[in-house]
Amino acid sequence: MSHPHRTLIASRRAFLAGTGMTALTALTLAACGANSRSSSGASASAKAGGNLTILTSATDVGWDPAKSQSMPMTSLGLVHRRLTTWKLAPGKPVELAPDLATDTGKASDDGRTWTFTLKKGLKFSDGSAITSAHIKHGVERSFAPALSGGLGYHKSLLAGAEGYQGPYSGAHLSSIETPDESTIVFHLARAFGDWPWIVAQPAFSPVPEGDDPATYSHAPIASGPYQIDQYKQGSSITLKRNPHWSKDTDSIRLALPDTFTFSLGQDETTSAQRLIADSGEDRNAFGADRVSAAQLAQVSANESAKSRLATSPEGGPLAFLAINVQRVSDVNVRKAIAHAVDKAAVVAALGGELGAQAASTYITPGIPGRQSYDLYPHDAAKAKELLTGKTVPALVLLTDNGAASKAMAEAVGQSLKEAGLTVTIEPVEPDTFTERASKGDGSTYDLAIANWNPDYPSANANIQPLFASSEIGSGGSNYARYSNAEVDAAIAQAQANLDAKAAQAQWAALDRKIAEEVPVVPLAYRRNSFLHGSGVAGFFVESYPAYPSYQVIGVSAS
């Protein structure tokens, strides 16, 4: 499981078990205490050149795309390009953009076949040409058991991929065709309108054949503007320019710094203090870890630091309470639980308005097509009314033992107690949480605190993982163990829709339909805050993906 609050990988799995801010306090902070976006704004004040340092608590950064869960705009995107990518700009929603491909794909066969053409003049860092065969090899190697752990949407979508074990034994996928060096064709098992977003994921980075899966993570062949220069285990990683990358083929990556230095294993509190002090080389640095609630209070009291804090305008990842519908089968009891929860108390537990916003929908802010509604506002009297005459056994509330998760669990438990319910909170190690909520049979818990960050900006990435019956057990994230054949069918219909606007309407309707059965209570949208030095420009955070884009950050011209 990835670290809960660093941007090096920035994936939904960073929030799967509900881990959250370190050094958490119940301190309530006012949203006006810091800028909603960094004062750096866009990259107009940045210049080419210099070194940009990234302070991170991570002790390593993996550069093998097959094993990565990263979003396109973070560290992996500096070294590896994909067929498509994300375009981010201050104050604007994320857009899909061509990367190695000339466009975002052409669908045929009613959405079951997708064709991409590569741009001309693409080269690896060793000077060799990038071809469609390298994209195919990159995708195929993601199926190898030795390279597990990366995003795997494509594995269930490509036709004939079931049981495939990768290319290293000589086997290849017939569902990926490369009729020439610049064309790649994907044949899917079913129509999937979000496929252009899927090919922006790490597995669709080109990898030359002959790679060594055991060492590629630390010695990759780059297709992006940077390549690894120095790798010091547990200490630092330095990136230098890839001389064979051409900005003429890449409209997304500004590639401003001459070098990037990843300073590994840094204590988060110490890093924040260094950035607040803003002296020496730290002026040209930023933190990959989210600023904790306690440190947000300190930043808010420091005008200089406050001007260098970037916070997602609206909340990002969803913190939620899953109700195990197999054990809490009475929908009115579930509605009572939803009305009983005081979300303001949950927000306070996460650090106040700078740390979170109260949630009411499953689709998170910044996702296209999201429609706001609130079926279950806090109403203790309504909760008690719904529970009248019912005998509800003591409820087991499962949570991981992270500070934020426990704080949310305490807030939820107190709310339910005030409604007349008996709740036992069980904090466990993250791996134990996964075993019980994700891999077990659901018999050991009634409620579970968790978080979810969608892998890409489509409501499918909010809804399907949490509510499809296929995601119950076996490592899935349907912690509510919710199974509804009509919902499964509606998910499949929305996924197959090639009309993005029409699909968005389907997802919004499905969001509300599921909420009527209350398998999950949305608690809060987590707001992410990141701090940077005064010499850093182009640093901003939007509601989605709620992380800074490494592709446009540079050193200021001052």
Task: For each feature predicted by the language model, list its residue ranges.
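Periplasmic binding protein-like
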Residues: 54, 127, 275, 279-281, ...
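N-terminal lobe/hinge region of extracytoplasmic solute-binding protein
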Residues: 55-109, 221
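Gly/Pro-rich hinge or "lid" segments in bacterial periplasmic/extracellular proteins
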Residues: 88-89, 171, 182, 187-254, ...
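Aromatic- and charge-enriched surface segment that lines or borders ligand/interaction sites
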Residues: 103-154, 185, 277, 329
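Alpha-helical secondary-structure segments
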Residues: 130-140, 181-188, 224-225, 255-259, ...
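Extracellular/periplasmic solute-recognition and catalytic clefts
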Residues: 149, 229-240, 261-325
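Structural transition elements
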Residues: 352-387, 402-407
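Long beta-strand-rich cores associated with HINT superfamily self-processing modules
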Residues: 530-558
